[in-house]
């Protein structure tokens, strides 16, 4: 986020979407950081939601213990439970951020020098979020972002993350192997979107495209 804030004033047209590791950060702090970036970039900020399953990363923060699991073994009940917990926490994280961005009404700032009033307190609202991982009362300490709701994105490689994309994101990045799998992934994400009551919301799903430059690795490297 700090790098994006530094880059923002020297750019004009690109969106700035830093990654936030939600497993080891707090949604209140992240929400105001992204809101500030939206001001610095005049409405071009977004956030990419990322979870961490690394015991090494967890040790650096010291907030929680992360089990050592083979996350590629998706049939392992322990892996499924752990992954679902991370993604569930991420969904709550996004919900808190969105509520905090909406906790200031658009005209909450008065900036009346004569009376010394900067805000109309009646236009700031508690969010009163209580979940399994967070309890956040609000409101935010940063005014409503220029966009209102900065763009939320997420990368998904499997069914559980697809649920996060469908239920919480504005943009989803996926990695299909072929066109048939791409259709299956989009169907799964749209189903999750509908189940979350977001069927009318705009959700863009973008797939990675692998480009082969040449049949030979050496020739491809040369190109």
Q: What does each of the following model-derived ranges do?
A:
Residues 1-223:
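N-terminal glycine-rich cofactor-binding segment that shapes the pocket for flavin-like pterin cofactors
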């Amino acid at each position: 986020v700090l790098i994006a804030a530094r880059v923002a004033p020297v750019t004009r047209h690109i969106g700035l979407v830093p990654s936030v590791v939600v497993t080891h950060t707090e949604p209140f702090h992240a929400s105001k950081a992204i809101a500030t970036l939206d001001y610095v970039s005049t409405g071009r900020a977004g956030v990419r939601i990322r979870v961490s399953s690394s015991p090494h990363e967890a040790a650096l923060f010291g907030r929680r213990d992360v089990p050592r699991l083979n996350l590629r073994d998706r049939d392992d009940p322990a892996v499924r439970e752990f992954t679902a917990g991370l993604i569930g926490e991420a969904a709550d994280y996004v919900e808190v951020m969105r509520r905090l961005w909406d906790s200031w009404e658009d005209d909450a700032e008065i900036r009346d020098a004569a009376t010394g009033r900067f805000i109309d307190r009646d236009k700031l609202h508690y969010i009163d979020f209580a979940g399994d991982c967070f309890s956040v009362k609000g409101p935010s300490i940063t005014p409503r972002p220029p966009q209102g709701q900065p763009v939320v994105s997420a990368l998904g490689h499997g069914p559980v993350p697809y649920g996060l994309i469908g239920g919480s994101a504005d943009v989803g990045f996926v990695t299909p192997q072929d066109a048939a799998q791409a259709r299956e992934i989009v169907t799964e994400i749209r189903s999750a979107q509908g189940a979350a009551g977001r069927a009318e919301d705009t959700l863009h799903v973008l797939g990675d495209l692998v480009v082969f430059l040449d049949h030979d690795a050496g020739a491809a490297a040369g190109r």
